[in-house]
C-alpha cells in the first residue's frame, strides 16, 4: 500500500526524522484560505499522487508570493498529471501539499528497503539526490552506497557510522545522519514497511539535515496490525479493479495487455504470463484466485477480468491441489451464463477432480476451448484472438 508524501512525513516525524512541513488541501475552495495561513517568502505547491517524477511533470512548483501560490494551486488541482510512473492518461490530482521553501546547500538520496535477493533489510544512499536513483545506478553505480542489516543482530552503530561517513558527513552532521538512520530503521520495522525513501535528503544553509520529500510503501500482509496506517489508504489513487479484487480476496494487478489470466498460485500465474509473451501476446493482468477459492470467487474473478476493456481473450490455468477443478468449472459456467463471455475462453485444468471438471465444461454447451497443458493453452488463446 502506498500513501501520500504528507502522510509519509507525518509518520517519519513521529519517529524523530526532521522533515519539511506544510498544509494539506483536498478541496479547491480551501486553497486560498490554506495558503493565507502560511507566512513565508517561498511557497512550494506539490501535487499529491502515488507516482514519482512529479517535479519533471509539473507537479511541484516553487513560487515567491501568495498570489502566485494561489494561482498555481488552482491550476494544478484537478488536472491529470502524467509522469513516467503513471498510466498514459495520468493521475488526477485530488490533493495538494503546500510547504514553505527551504534554502538548499546539498541534496542526497536515502532509503531503506527489504532486499529479497539478500533476505535482509538494506539501506541505499547516494550523494546524488533529487534525481531518479535508477538513473544514478545506471550511469554512475559507484555513487550508490549499500549497507545490509543482518536480521539476527538488527541495526548496529557501525551501520549508522558507515552511512554517515560514506555520504561525507562530519561532526554534527554525522551525528544528525546517525539519528536519521536509526529513526528511519525503527519506522520501517515497526510499521511493516516495504520501502521508505527520502529523496532528497538535504543539507540546509544552516547545516541541518532535512527530509524534503518522502515516500513510504507498506507490506499489505502487515496492514491488519496497523489500522491507523490502513486508514491512510486513498482509494482514488488505486486502480478500481485492484480495489474490487482485494475486497473479494483476490490478488489482481492490471498489466495492460490483451489476454486476461485467471490462475491459482503466484508462481503459476507468473509462468502463465511468461508463456503468453513467448507465444506473441501480452497478459492483461496478474490474477491469483488463491488455493481455497469457491464458486463465487471464481465468478467474481472472471467479472473483474472482463471489466478491463482491453481484454480480447481469457486463459484460465488451474492446478487443483487444495482447489477442486470441478468447483472451478462450475464458477466458470456460472460467470459465463451470468455476464456473458463474448471473448475466446481457453481453460486448462489439472489436478484434483480434473476429469469431473472437464466433463462439466464439455457438457455446459458453452464455447469453451479446452487445453491439455500450459503450452497448448497459450498457443490456443493467442491463436483465438488473431
From Swiss-Prot:
Binds 1 Mg(2+) ion per subunit. InterPro entries: ATP-grasp, ATP-grasp_succ-CoA_synth-type, ATP_grasp_subdomain_1, Succ-CoA_synthase_bsu_CS, SUCC_ACL_C, Succ_CoA_ligase-like_bsu, Succinyl-CoA_synth-like. Its cofactor is Mg(2+). ATP binds at residues 46, 53-55, 99, 102, 107. The keyword Membrane does not apply. Keywords: ATP-binding, Ligase, Magnesium, Metal-binding, Nucleotide-binding, Tricarboxylic acid cycle. Pathway: Carbohydrate metabolism; tricarboxylic acid cycle; succinate from succinyl-CoA (ligase route): step 1/1. Substrate binds at residues 264, 321-323. It catalyses: succinate + ATP + CoA = succinyl-CoA + ADP + phosphate; GTP + succinate + CoA = succinyl-CoA + GDP + phosphate. Its EC number is 6.2.1.5. Residues 9-244 form the ATP-grasp domain. One of its GO terms (biological process) is succinyl-CoA metabolic process. GO terms for cellular component: cytosol; succinate-CoA ligase complex. The keyword Nucleotide-binding applies. GO terms for molecular function: ATP binding; magnesium ion binding; succinate-CoA ligase (ADP-forming) activity; succinate-CoA ligase (GDP-forming) activity. Pfam families: ATP-grasp_2, Ligase_CoA. Mg(2+) binds at residues 199, 213. Succinyl-CoA synthetase functions in the citric acid cycle (TCA), coupling the hydrolysis of succinyl-CoA to the synthesis of either ATP or GTP and thus represents the only step of substrate-level phosphorylation in the TCA. The beta subunit provides nucleotide specificity of the enzyme and binds the substrate succinate, while the binding sites for coenzyme A and phosphate are found in the alpha subunit. Heterotetramer of two alpha and two beta subunits. Belongs to the succinate/malate CoA ligase beta subunit family. This is Succinate--CoA ligase [ADP-forming] subunit beta. It comes from Rickettsia akari (strain Hartford). The gene is sucC.
Amino acid at each position: 500500500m502506498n500513501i501520500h508524501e504528507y502522510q509519509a512525513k507525518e509518520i517519519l516525524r513521529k519517529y524523530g526524522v526532521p522533515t519539511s512541513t506544510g498544509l494539506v488541501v483536498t478541496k479547491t475552495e480551501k486553497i486560498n484560505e490554506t495558503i493565507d495561513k502560511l507566512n513565508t517568502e517561498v511557497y512550494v505547491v506539490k501535487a499529491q499522487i502515488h507516482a514519482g517524477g512529479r517535479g519533471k511533470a509539473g507537479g511541484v512548483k516553487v513560487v515567491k508570493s501568495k498570489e502566485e501560490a494561489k494561482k498555481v494551486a488552482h491550476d494544478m488541482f484537478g488536472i491529470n498529471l502524467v509522469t513516467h510512473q503513471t498510466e498514459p492518461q495520468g493521475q488526477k490530482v485530488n490533493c495538494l501539499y503546500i510547504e514553505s521553501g527551504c534554502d538548499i546547500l546539498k541534496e542526497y538520496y536515502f532509503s531503506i528497503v527489504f532486499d529479497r535477493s539478500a533476505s535482509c533489510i538494506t539501506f541505499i544512499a547516494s550523494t546524488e539526490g533529487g534525481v531518479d536513483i535508477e538513473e544514478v545506478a545506471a550511469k554512475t553505480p559507484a555513487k550508490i552506497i549499500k549497507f545490509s542489516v543482518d536480521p539476527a543482530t538488527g541495526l548496529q552503530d557501525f551501520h549508522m557510522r558507515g552511512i554517515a561517513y560514506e555520504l561525507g558527513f562530519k561532526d554534527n552532521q554525522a551525528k544528525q545522519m546517525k539519528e536519521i538512520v536509526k529513526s528511519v530503521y525503527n519506522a520501517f520495522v515497526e510499521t511493516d514497511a516495504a520501502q521508505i525513501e527520502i529523496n532528497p535528503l538535504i543539507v540546509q544553509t544552516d547545516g541541518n539535515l532535512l527530509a524534503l520529500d518522502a515516500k513510504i510503501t507498506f507490506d499489505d500482509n502487515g496492514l491488519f496490525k496497523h489500522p491507523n496506517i490502513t486508514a491512510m489508504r486513498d482509494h482514488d489513487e488505486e486502480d478500481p479493479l485492484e480495489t474490487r479484487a482485494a475486497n473479494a480476496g483476490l490478488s489482481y494487478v492490471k498489466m495492460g495487455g490483451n489476454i486476461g489470466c485467471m490462475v491459482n498460485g503466484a508462481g503459476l500465474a507468473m509462468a502463465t504470463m511468461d508463456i503468453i509473451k513467448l507465444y506473441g501476446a501480452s497478459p492483461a493482468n496478474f490474477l491469483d484466485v488463491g488455493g481455497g477459492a469457491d464458486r463465487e470467487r471464481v465468478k467474481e474473478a472472471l467479472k473483474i477480468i472482463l471489466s478491463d476493456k482491453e481484454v480480447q481473450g481469457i486463459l484460465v490455468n488451474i492446478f487443483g491441489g487444495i482447489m477442486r477443478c470441478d468447483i472451478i468449472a462450475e464458477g466458470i459456467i456460472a460467470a459465463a451464463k451470468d455476464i456473458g463471455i463474448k471473448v475466446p475462453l481457453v481453460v486448462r485444468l489439472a489436478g484434483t477432480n480434473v476429469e469431473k471438471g472437464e466433463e462439466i465444461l464439455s457438457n455446459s454447451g458453452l464455447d469453451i476451448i479446452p487445453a491439455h497443458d500450459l503450452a497448448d493453452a497459450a498457443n490456443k488463446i493467442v491463436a483465438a484472438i488473431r
